[in-house]
């Protein structure tokens, strides 16, 4: 049989400021000149779950080109510590910054950030704050936060359409959120 196939990622727990974070590092393929590493900045909520397989496929493709990829589940997501409702933008930014530091400490350095949807916004913010990351790859970046939030809330509306007493508008959900109430959207 020829070829070993794709290399399995190195899976480990990265220490975040509030607990252990699931991390998977896809190193550059053996025999390929290393070009450095990128950090994947995932999309938000259900979009993150729907993109997991694609992110792994892309990380393997980058590996074949000599680019390592670190995928981190921020606090309260995936297999990381915490509950989703406890996560904040600031917390997730800190968690991804810990990923950048991990890449720097392990020799190849962080040459770029790869962000998908709302993760693209996070990647741009991280790059500006860090000041030393030369490359950004932004897939389908969110350009209008209000529109994104409305689309996100529509997931909940769709789930309640058949219920007579269900929430019927994104305005109702916005009012709950503005009052400090948690709004469950999709589980």
Predicted regions and their residues:
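Gly/Ala-rich beta-loop-alpha elbow adjacent to hydrolase catalytic centers
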Residues: 114-123, 140
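The alpha/beta-hydrolase serine catalytic core
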Residues: 132-187
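Active-site signature of alpha/beta-hydrolase-fold catalytic machinery across serine-
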Residues: 125-129
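Short, surface-exposed "cap/lid" segments of acyl-processing enzymes
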Residues: 18, 26-73
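An N-terminal hydrophobic leader/cap segment in hydrolases
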Residues: 1-31
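Alpha/beta-hydrolase active-site loop signature
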Residues: 45, 74-79, 143
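Catalytic nucleophile-loop/oxyanion-hole region of alpha/beta-hydrolase
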Residues: 77-110
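Structural motif
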Residues: 36-39, 112, 135
